[in-house]
Amino acid sequence: MNIEIREKDDERAVFVVEGVDDTFINTIRRICLVEIPTLAIEDVNIYKNDAKMFDEVLAHRLGLIPIVTDLDSYVMPSECDCESGCQHCRVSFLLKEKCEEGNDSKIVYSKDLKSDDPAVKPVYDTIPIVRLREGEEVELEAIAELGLGSEHAKWQATTTCGYKYYPKIEIDTEKVNDLEEYVEECPRNVLQIEDDTLVVGNIENCSTCRTCQRLSEKDDNAIVVDFEESKYIFKIETDGSLKPFDVLTIACDILSEKADNIINFVNEEE
């Protein structure tokens, strides 16, 4: 298997994978979507809420705030030895804000959540939680714990995770006429003209829409659009709780563990 990185930052990664089949790459995709543990607010104790927003809506909005996840310091509640929650499986956030007299309104943001662990905090500071009017106050405690995307979308580490087959375009340059027309009709600007010859530019931008192939019917099917066997373009974006390649590493570890469990089961049955 060969991997070539095209883009990489703290929230997005694009890379080309070669030498695997779609069953393997789709398994990695599904694990990234629903089996990567992340921190999210699960329980909310509301002590005071003068805002017009219902308690249930407020709690729901808190649950969807992405939280920086430290998998080395926390474990899933089901794997913790405690019975009621402890510092190894839960993180507490306190929120106490008031719109003082003389102010028309005040927006409470995610940055106003105060964590008892400095390393665990909302990924973004400017997520609006609730608007308070003059004299209104909100006070609550929010408890975050690890969970899986298969249980609730708030625990999904990835916002986008998918792949496409690596495109392939074959051009019979001796048959192609009206080169400018092909360039203009390509919606992804893949085709270019170099030295009076129609060539493929950035092939990875191709969506295999086959517009050029249909257009080439007038030129005796001079263009054929297909895809490479066992070669894919994989894209992954996270909500910031984990970095993309951390998600991929964990996904591969999970897949390896599943394979080991099957091997051990088979060996025990023999």
UniProtKB/Swiss-Prot annotation:
One of its GO terms (biological process) is DNA-templated transcription. Gene3D superfamilies: 3.30.70.3110, DNA-directed RNA polymerase, insert domain, RNA polymerase, RBP11-like subunit. Its EC number is 2.7.7.6. InterPro entries: DNA-dir_RNA_pol_30-40kDasu_CS, DNA-dir_RNA_pol_insert, DNA-dir_RNA_pol_RpoA/D/Rpb3, RBP11-like, RNAP_Rpo3/Rpb3/RPAC1, RNApol_insert_sf, Rpo3/RPB3_RNA_Pol_subunit. It is found in: Cytoplasm. GO terms for cellular component: cytoplasm; DNA-directed RNA polymerase complex. It comes from the Archaea. GO terms for molecular function: 3 iron, 4 sulfur cluster binding; DNA binding; DNA-directed RNA polymerase activity; metal ion binding; protein dimerization activity. [3Fe-4S] cluster binds at C206, C209, C212. It catalyses: RNA(n) + a ribonucleoside 5'-triphosphate = RNA(n+1) + diphosphate. Keywords: 3Fe-4S, Cytoplasm, DNA-directed RNA polymerase, Iron, Iron-sulfur, Metal-binding, Nucleotidyltransferase, Transcription, Transferase. Its cofactor is [3Fe-4S] cluster. Belongs to the archaeal Rpo3/eukaryotic RPB3 RNA polymerase subunit family. Part of the RNA polymerase complex. DNA-dependent RNA polymerase (RNAP) catalyzes the transcription of DNA into RNA using the four ribonucleoside triphosphates as substrates. This is DNA-directed RNA polymerase subunit Rpo3. It comes from Methanosphaera stadtmanae (strain ATCC 43021 / DSM 3091 / JCM 11832 / MCB-3). The lineage of its organism: Archaea, Methanobacteriati, Methanobacteriota, Methanomada group, Methanobacteria. The gene is rpo3.
